[in-house]
From Swiss-Prot:
Gene: FGA
Organism: Rangifer tarandus (Reindeer)
Compartment list: Secreted
Any one cellular-component term (Gene Ontology): extracellular region
Stated name of the protein: Fibrinogen alpha chain
Assembly behavior: Heterohexamer; disulfide linked. Contains 2 sets of 3 non-identical chains (alpha, beta and gamma). The 2 heterotrimers are in head to head conformation with the N-termini in a small central domain.
Organism superkingdom: Eukaryota
PTM comment: Conversion of fibrinogen to fibrin is triggered by thrombin, which cleaves fibrinopeptides A and B from alpha and beta chains, and thus exposes the N-terminal polymerization sites responsible for the formation of the soft clot. The soft clot is converted into the hard clot by factor XIIIA which catalyzes the epsilon-(gamma-glutamyl)lysine cross-linking between gamma chains (stronger) and between alpha chains (weaker) of different monomers. Forms F13A-mediated cross-links between a glutamine and the epsilon-amino group of a lysine residue, forming fibronectin-fibrinogen heteropolymers.
Main location: secreted
Length: 19
């Protein structure tokens, strides 16, 4: 959810750093 990962899993629209 920190936006560090463009394919994040917590909040896709926000980038989400957690998968």
């Amino acid at each position: 959810a920190d936006g560090s990962d463009p394919a994040g899993g917590e909040f896709l629209e926000a980038g989400g750093g957690v998968r």
